[in-house]
């Protein structure tokens, strides 16, 4: 059964539809495992461009039958093969007979290592390359024997198999076993290659036996008669053949057995003689005094001081006294002395994004002007905020916590024991984003420590970590769980005072090595509930090899789908949607696709941002092939692999083997990522690696997080009214070729049980391969939460799963936060649908949450006390961004093409707003049809070319009418996680779904005219910008996805002039720091590109560079042709600002003139180096940096005396600097 070529085992539904679409013939079919019923199958059949899925269920006797509606006769079959044969004839109940089987894809089971996993001192690294005898010359028995032995190896329990022996056996069974068999037939007396394996395995046993024999001889010398003790000589095994080594080992074992069997008798005889001759007696040992050490208390918090500049008050020293709960402002001058500010007087702290060292403190009242503090560095500011939060938590009157600190670490130990101290790892000391020394020793609430290639046992390793934590924090942490899969381990510890808050602890593991049967690669996981917050921790070791990125993606998808963690009622969802917070760490093994020498050059210059363009994980995340919707903090530390053991001075990127030189360029193999529910509070506070642990080729990596937690016990007093969640309408786009009906399943921890909707009442297939589904309020259930408190509901989430009515298989899942809607009358949501880690579509809806009036009390959280506010440019950008539509309706598709704001070229808009997509040429306006490139967000975007089989008589007999989208070379820019990690942002859709607000005064014809004229304006701007004075080479165009910022400066002058002429009444769009394609790639272009390889890189090799139509939607949704002032009124301010008495944004920024705005957006320096370069005084950069003037905010307050002291001796140069300082202090 399983050997049938049309049986595809556990492939996903989407992959099955893709294979059938590729086949393209009616009657094409395949069979896969059912995703909804264990042990069942799904028969997928292509007919008239649609995939029809039938469920095959086994009965009590094991007979198989296709599930049918009531009243239809059921035909039973013994095997899947019989069932397929039975339905190859027409009129058997299927929509078409099973005519053309779609064959299973060939899988390369090559799990050979690239040298990453070899242990130190292993001779396996120097073994000759694998030699496999040709099939023509090998006898049948020789080829059958290895296959049988490999099957036995796969069936072994992972606990009984060592990681290294797997590699040796794999090597032996794939080649050398055949040679041994042939040698036996040729008259050989032994298995030469097998003896080599035995010799290699027993290499370490020689030294162990020598050490054991030496210890036993010491015992014999002490207790035995001097003339009777045993002597032996250490036998050397170096340079001997495997057979001689085995003989040597057997001799040592014989000696060891003889000594062990006689030593106790010798000692007993010696003791008897000593008692008889010297009248000795054994006295009972006096009981020792209580050796139990007194319980260690956590170290007291000292008073921490910070040097700051307070605007309008000058330099001061601010001290934080956590124990007393006060701030001390020492002005150092004047008669005011030291000012004491108690904790209860601090109303709010506000951090600005563009002022990384600036902090605003609201004291006593929001109506008072806030105090503006500028710290020496961002690290100092973050330490100050952390201490204030700790002080507020310490002195809080509430019994439950609002925020905790979580440590996540990963380290590939390389098969060697760890050093005696791991303190630098658990205290986040080293390179990258590290905490200030004032808070580095503060203990975290939870520690999750993951390792790979760990040679120590579970108990030994866990005790080692606990001892390290005890030494560094003076706290005896409690072990929550330890989970292992071979040498992959994950240990979770918690503070003793939190032990009662931990519940529902689960552990699991998944094998991904050698066809998902061996645990040398795979993942382990631990999940827990901290009060009402669910957390998951995953530690994985993925496939190694620079060219194995696709297999690593598959490893991730298998782990996501198969790791059994969390609540059982959420088993419908993969683990990325089962937890409020999921932390994923491990040796992911994604490499840098770049020459090793180029990598070393950039690492030596600390140009990590440029290297991120070549990082495989970054690329795969952008293509949404792996870790979709996960976040990662900006990497500011050098690659953690592959170092020379014993130091961190150099990378060992070349390995000399008998088969040649193997190159492993430095890479960021060890990573920490996370994914949280929308509107959840989580901030990455550190991300780096150690620089003083040398025992492995990998450096340990650490990350810490500030995580908001939910109270477990809401108020429970009786209430006559219950809260309710009323769903008014939902629309979804699902990536499928099926014609089935669908329903939505709702899950939530605030509901007693899952609820289902009725079948969708509208369904359209306007784009081949996508279904547009709609549910009105009549089809949607009314949900009643268990608890009706607003305080409880604003932390809750709804999990939605779109399932088919025929097979009950999920076609996409998502998470929606109740927080933004609780207490309001109406709100909308929009987000993407995912399944098995892949993007499957999108969904939007409108719902209302009703809370009884007496249950609407809420309290301020500790993390809400410290807010993060965007600066004036960010606020302008938000005000000019498209707001979500407040209402929508489900209508029949319209025949006419009507353009609406922001919906010109986005396929998602066409599907949602009843507009035709690029299907027929006559339906497309000429401005769109002729456009090859458009300008969007400071980037040139190549429009996709959509081809289909709608031509007249051009339909291939082997192809069905599925739309094929050719992906442009310029991928869509997106905002990296590092720019949004500190915001409380929901997991919105990856592409815009809602159109801009409706303009009543504009008729459809006028809107269409406006669209055409504006698109013509943009295209003309592009043509002008491609003039010889700013001409870009073809290489730059083809590689614009790596460094798209090369377009912004070249095209800026002409674009600004034309935009100003065309929309002179509108405000300029602040696009200086537009969204980036890859995280951390600078949008500023230096005079000479420091990373020439970005532009001159050759065309990528052919492979999987595809994006889905949904990703094209995101690319095109960023094209905006409407004037900004007509769509998004500039005067609108966030509601959060209006509700306070004092406007934290700079009011003067609202009155910027056009000329001033252009100069600010495109000429203002962002660093001290840029400012000095603009003034032609870059020679002073190093001297000023050495004197501590490396932060622009801090530098803007410099005086002439301080300039002179820093080395600016020329008076005219000092005057030029002072006259051009940024005006940020007023």
Swiss-Prot record:
Its protein name is: Phosphatidylinositol 3,4,5-trisphosphate 5-phosphatase 2B
The record describes its post-translational modification as:
Tyrosine phosphorylated by the members of the SRC family after exposure to a diverse array of extracellular stimuli.
Molecular function, one GO term: phosphatidylinositol-3,4,5-trisphosphate 5-phosphatase activity
Which EC numbers characterise this protein's activity in its record?
3.1.3.86
Q: Give the intrachain disulfide bonds.
A: none
Q: Which family does this protein fall into?
A: Belongs to the inositol 1,4,5-trisphosphate 5-phosphatase family.
Q: Specify the taxonomic lineage.
A: Eukaryota, Metazoa, Chordata, Craniata, Vertebrata
Q: Which GO terms describe its cellular component?
A: cytoskeleton; cytosol; filopodium; lamellipodium; membrane; nuclear speck; nucleus
Q: Does the keyword Hydrolase apply?
A: yes
**Broad class of enzyme this protein falls into:** hydrolase
Indicate the segments forming the SH2 domain, all copies. Answer: 6-102
Enumerate composition-biased segments (Acidic residues): 108-117
SMART domains in the cross-refs: IPPc (SM00128), SH2 (SM00252)
Q: Provide the positions where the record notes the PTM Phosphotyrosine.
A: 909
Tell me the domain comment: The SH2 domain interacts with tyrosine phosphorylated forms of proteins.
Q: Supply one GO BP term.
A: immune system process
Q: Which reaction does it catalyse?
A: a 1,2-diacyl-sn-glycero-3-phospho-(1D-myo-inositol-3,4,5-trisphosphate) + H2O = a 1,2-diacyl-sn-glycero-3-phospho-(1D-myo-inositol-3,4-bisphosphate) + phosphate
Coiled-coil stretches noted in the UniProt entry, renumbered to this chain:
none
Write out the function statement from the record.
Phosphatidylinositol (PtdIns) phosphatase that specifically hydrolyzes the 5-phosphate of phosphatidylinositol-3,4,5-trisphosphate (PtdIns(3,4,5)P3) to produce PtdIns(3,4)P2, thereby negatively regulating the PI3K (phosphoinositide 3-kinase) pathways. Plays a central role in regulation of PI3K-dependent insulin signaling, although the precise molecular mechanisms and signaling pathways remain unclear. Part of a signaling pathway that regulates actin cytoskeleton remodeling.
Residues annotated as region Disordered?
Answer: 106-144, 945-964, 985-1035
Motif annotated as NPXY motif, chain positions: 906-909
Q: Per UniProt, which keywords does this protein have?
A: Actin-binding, Cell adhesion, Cell projection, Cytoplasm, Cytoskeleton, Hydrolase, Immunity, Lipid metabolism, Membrane, Nucleus, Phosphoprotein, SH2 domain, SH3-binding
Q: Which PROSITE patterns match?
A: SAM_DOMAIN (PS50105), SH2 (PS50001)
Gene encoding this chain?
inppl1b
Asked if the record carries the keyword RNA-binding, the reply is no
- In this chain the SAM domain maps to 1163-1226
């Amino acid at each position: 059964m399983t050997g049938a070529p049309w049986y595809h085992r556990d492939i996903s539904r989407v992959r099955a539809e893709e294979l059938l679409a590729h086949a393209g013939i009616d009657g094409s079919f395949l069979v896969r495992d059912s995703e909804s019923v264990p042990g069942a199958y799904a028969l997928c059949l292509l007919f008239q461009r649609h995939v029809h899925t039938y469920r095959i269920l086994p009965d009590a006797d094991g007979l198989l039958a296709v599930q049918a509606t009531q009243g239809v006769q059921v035909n039973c079959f013994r095997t899947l093969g019989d069932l397929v044969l039975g339905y190859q004839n027409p009129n058997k109940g299927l929509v078409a007979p099973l005519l053309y089987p779609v064959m299973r894809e060939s899988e390369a089971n090559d799990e050979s290592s690239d040298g990453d996993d070899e242990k130190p001192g292993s001779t396996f690294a120097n073994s000759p390359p694998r030699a496999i005898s040709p099939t023509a010359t090998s006898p049948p028995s020789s080829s059958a024997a290895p296959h049988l032995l490999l099957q036995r190896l796969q069936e072994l329990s992972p606990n009984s198999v060592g990681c290294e022996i797997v590699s040796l056996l794999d090597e032996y069974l794939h080649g050398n076993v055949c040679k041994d068999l042939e040698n036996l037939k040729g008259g050989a007396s032994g298995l030469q290659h097998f003896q080599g394996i035995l010799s290699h395995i027993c290499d370490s046993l020689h030294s162990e036996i020598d050490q054991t024999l030496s210890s036993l001889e010491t015992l014999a010398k002490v207790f035995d008669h001097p003339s009777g003790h045993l002597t032996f000589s250490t036998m050397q095994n170096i340079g001997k053949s495997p057979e001689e080594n085995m003989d040597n080992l057997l001799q040592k074992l014989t000696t060891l057995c003889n000594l062990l069997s006689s030593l106790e008798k010798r000692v007993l005889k010696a003791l008897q003689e000593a008692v008889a001759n010297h009248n000795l007696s054994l006295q009972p040992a006096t009981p020792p005094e209580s050796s139990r050490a007194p319980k260690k208390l956590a170290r007291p918090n000292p008073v921490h001081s910070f040097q700051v500049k307070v605007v309008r008050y000058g330099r001061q020293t601010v001290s934080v006294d956590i124990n007393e709960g006060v701030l001390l402002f020492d002005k150092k001058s004047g008669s005011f002395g030291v000012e004491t500010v108690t904790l209860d007087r601090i109303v709010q702290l506000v951090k600005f994004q563009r002022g990384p060292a600036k902090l605003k403190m609201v004291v006593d009242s929001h109506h008072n002007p806030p105090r503006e503090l500028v710290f020496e560095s961002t690290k100092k500011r973050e330490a100050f905020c952390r201490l204030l939060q700790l002080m507020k938590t310490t002195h809080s009157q509430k019994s439950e916590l609002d925020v905790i600190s979580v440590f996540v670490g990963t380290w590939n130990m390389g098969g060697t024991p760890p050093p005696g101290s791991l303190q630098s790892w658990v205290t986040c000391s080293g390179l990258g984003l590290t905490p200030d020394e004032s808070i580095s020793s503060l203990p975290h609430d939870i520690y999750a420590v993951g390792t790979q290639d760990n040679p120590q046992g579970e108990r030994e390793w866990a005790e080692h970590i606990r001892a390290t934590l005890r030494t560094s924090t003076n706290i005896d942490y409690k072990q929550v769980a330890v989970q292992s899969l071979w040498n992959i381990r994950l240990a979770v510890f918690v503070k003793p005072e939190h032990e009662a808050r931990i519940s529902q602890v689960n552990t699991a593991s998944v094998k991904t090595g050698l066809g998902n049967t061996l645990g040398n690669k795979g993942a382990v996981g631990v999940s827990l509930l901290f009060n009402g917050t669910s957390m998951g921790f995953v530690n994985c070791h993925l496939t190694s090899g620079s060219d194995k990125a696709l297999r690593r993606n598959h490893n991730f998808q298998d782990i996501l789908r198969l790791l059994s963690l969390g609540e059982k009622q959420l088993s419908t969802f993969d683990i990325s949607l089962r937890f409020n917070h999921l932390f994923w760490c491990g040796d992911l093994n994604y490499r840098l696709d770049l020459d090793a020498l180029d990598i070393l050059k950039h690492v030596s210059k600390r140009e990590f941002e440029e290297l991120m363009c070549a990082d495989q994980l970054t690329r795969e995340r952008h293509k949404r092939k792996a870790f979709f919707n996960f976040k990662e903090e900006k990497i500011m530390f050098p690659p953690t692999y592959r170092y020379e053991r014993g130091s961190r001075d150099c990378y060992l990127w070349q390995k000399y083997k008998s088969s040649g030189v193997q190159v492993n360029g430095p890479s960021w193999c060890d990573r920490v990522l996370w994914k949280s529910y929308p509107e959840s509070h989580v901030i990455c506070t550190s991300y780096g690696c150690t620089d003083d642990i040398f025992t492995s080729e990998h450096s340990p990596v650490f990350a810490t997080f500030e995580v908001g937690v939910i109270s477990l016990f809401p108020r429970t007093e009786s209430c006559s009214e219950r809260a309710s969640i009323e769903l008014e309408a939902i629309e979804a786009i699902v990536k499928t070729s099926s014609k089935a009906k669908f329903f939505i399943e709702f899950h939530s921890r605030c509901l007693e049980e899952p609820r289902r909707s009725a079948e969708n009442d509208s369904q359209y297939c306007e784009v081949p391969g996508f279904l547009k589904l709609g549910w009105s309020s009549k089809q949607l259930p009314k949900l009643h939460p268990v608890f009706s408190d607003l305080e409880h509901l604003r932390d809750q989430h709804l999990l939605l799963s779109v399932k088919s009515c025929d097979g009950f298989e999920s076609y996409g899942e998502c998470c929606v936060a109740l927080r933004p809607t609780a207490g309001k009358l109406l709100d909308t949501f929009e987000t993407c649908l995912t399944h098995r880690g892949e993007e499957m579509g999108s969904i939007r809806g409108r719902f209302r949450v009703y809370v009884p009036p007496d249950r609407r009390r809420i309290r301020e959280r500790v993390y809400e006390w410290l807010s993060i506010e965007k600066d004036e440019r960010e606020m302008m950008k938000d005000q000019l961004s498209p707001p979500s539509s407040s209402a929508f309706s489900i209508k029949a598709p319209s025949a006419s093409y009507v353009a609406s704001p922001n919906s010109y070229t986005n396929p998602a808009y066409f599907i949602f707003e009843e507009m035709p997509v690029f299907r027929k040429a006559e339906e497309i306006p000429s401005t769109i049809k002729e456009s090859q490139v458009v300008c969007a967000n400071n980037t040139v975007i190549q429009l996709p070319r959509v081809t289909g089989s709608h031509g007249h008589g051009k339909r291939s007999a082997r192809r069905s009418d599925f739309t094929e989208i050719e992906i442009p070379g310029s991928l869509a820019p997106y905002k990296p996680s590092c720019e949004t990690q500190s915001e409380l942002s929901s997991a919105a859709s990856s592409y815009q779904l809602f159109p801009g607000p409706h303009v009543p005064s504009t008729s459809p014809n006028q809107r269409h005219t406006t669209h055409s004229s504006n698109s013509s304006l943009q295209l003309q701007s592009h043509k002008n910008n491609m003039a010889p004075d700013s001409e870009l080479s073809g290489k730059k165009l083809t590689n614009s996805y790596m460094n798209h910022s090369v377009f912004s400066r070249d095209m800026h002058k002409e674009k600004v002039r034309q935009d100003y002429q065309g929309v002179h009444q509108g405000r300029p769009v602040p696009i200086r720091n537009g969204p980036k394609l890859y995280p951390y790639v600078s949008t500023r272009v230096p005079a000479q590109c420091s990373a020439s390889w970005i532009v001159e890189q050759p065309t990528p090799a052919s492979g999987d560079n595809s994006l889905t139509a949904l990703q094209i939607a995101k690319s095109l949704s960023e094209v905006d042709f409407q004037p900004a002032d007509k769509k998004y009124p500039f005067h609108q301010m966030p509601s959060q600002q209006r509700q306070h008495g004092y406007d934290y944004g700079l009011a003067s920024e609202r009155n910027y003139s056009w000329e001033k705005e252009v100069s600010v957006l495109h000429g203002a320096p962002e660093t001290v180096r840029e400012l000095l370069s603009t003034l032609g005084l870059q020679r002073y950069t190093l001297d000023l940096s050495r004197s501590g003037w490396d932060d622009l905010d801090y530098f803007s307050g410099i005086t002439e005396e301080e300039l002179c002291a820093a080395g600016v001796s020329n008076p005219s140069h000092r005057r030029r600097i002072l006259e051009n300082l940024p005006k940020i202090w007023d």
